[in-house]
């Protein structure tokens, strides 16, 4: 059954594993996450997967919520998502990672703000 109206999916995640960008998923023995076991998540999840999983819906746009990227370089996730959007058309908007206790938080926020799909942190 296809939904008869367009939907903005306001919370999803994309990731490509194997590059050390997701310490919580790429550990040698990933521990259960606060939301449960991580075993079902131990694979890449990219726009093609998302389109397959949402094929029954009229997705008008989607919002990627930061996926606990390696906090050593939070701008890298925003940059990767913009490259992904340019190549694949998704996500439509990005909520980025920012840790306010960082000494360089002003630079991190300015860096995120430079990306046009950014909508918040």
Predicted regions and their residues:
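Helix-coil boundary/capping segments in enzymes
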Residues: 1-121
């Amino acid at each position: 059954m296809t939904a008869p109206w367009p939907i903005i999916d306001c919370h999803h995640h994309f990731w490509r594993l194997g590059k050390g960008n997701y310490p919580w998923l790429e550990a040698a023995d990933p521990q259960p996450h606060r939301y449960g076991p991580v075993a079902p998540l131990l694979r890449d999840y990219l726009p093609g997967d998302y389109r397959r999983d949402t094929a029954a819906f009229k997705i008008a746009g989607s919002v990627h919520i930061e996926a606990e990227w390696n906090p050593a370089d939070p701008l890298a996730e925003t940059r990767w998502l913009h490259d992904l959007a340019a190549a694949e058309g998704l996500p439509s908007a990005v909520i980025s990672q920012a840790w306010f206790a960082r000494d360089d938080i002003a630079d991190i926020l300015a860096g995120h703000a430079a990306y046009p799909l950014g909508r918040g942190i």
